[in-house]
Amino acid sequence: MYSVVCLIGSTKFESTFRELEESLTLKGYLIFSPLVYNQSGDKPGCGKKAKELIDVATKLKINHSDIVVVVDVDGYMGNSTKAQRDHALFLNKPVLYYSKGEVSRL
């Protein structure tokens, strides 16, 4: 059986997400990742309501994951990411941090 990894973090790190998606997929992991990258805030239909919907969807992805990876380039974590991380910890999911090099353990 494949382990499911959920990547969480600010979508301003899209290139890091993409690199992790590829490298972890090639190692045999199933990946949940942001599917909407709208850091600039200019995508049509991506207002406050969409952000709330995406936050709920991310928590559902965490519920179905075996491992959560926080994509925290240079240690940066916004409020949404902190809430998602706390949700994972509440569920006793292993949480690894990109900034600490912990992803290499996968």
Sequence positions of predicted segments:
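Conserved catalytic or regulatory cores that recognize and/or transform ribose-phosphate-containing ligands
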Residues: 1-106
